[in-house]
């Protein structure tokens, strides 16, 4: 499965309780509809925007990392579009994290093979 990162910004005039509910709904949507495995949810809170969006100078930022086969990401895009509380969103495939994970797995496999070789040579 591939690793993805999605970041979205919720309008700051939405209540804190409603913003928390929206984040949970996105997580649930990813798990149930996209069949993704959500790994981390990182709430940044209300931050100043780089530029004004509509009438807003601030927004509530959230970043989610999840694993998915890539199917259903268009459904996530549509989910954000139909909910006016979301000002901006973007989803990226994190190939850098995938490479890092593969590299670590190869190193671990290499270490395991070295340990087996050392054990075999010490028993002879």
UniProtKB/Swiss-Prot annotation:
Q: Which PANTHER family match?
A: MITOCHONDRIAL 28S RIBOSOMAL PROTEIN S6, SMALL RIBOSOMAL SUBUNIT PROTEIN BS6M
Q: Can you name one GO molecular function term for this protein?
A: structural constituent of ribosome
Q: Where is the composition biased (Polar residues)?
A: 110-124
UniProt protein name:
Small ribosomal subunit protein bS6
> What superkingdom heads the lineage?
Bacteria
Q: Which family does it belong to?
A: Belongs to the bacterial ribosomal protein bS6 family.
Region labeled Disordered — which residues?
A: 100-124
Query: Native species of this protein?
Result: Fervidobacterium nodosum (strain ATCC 35602 / DSM 5306 / Rt17-B1)
Instruction: Name the Gene3D superfamilies for this protein.
Output: 3.30.70.60
Q: Does the keyword Transferase apply?
A: no
Keywords, A to Z, come to:
Ribonucleoprotein, Ribosomal protein, RNA-binding, rRNA-binding
Q: Which GO terms describe its biological process?
A: translation
Gene Ontology CC entries for this record:
cytoplasm; ribonucleoprotein complex; ribosome
Task performed by this protein: Binds together with bS18 to 16S ribosomal RNA.
Q: Does the keyword Membrane apply?
A: no
Upper taxonomic lineage: Bacteria, Thermotogati, Thermotogota, Thermotogae, Thermotogales
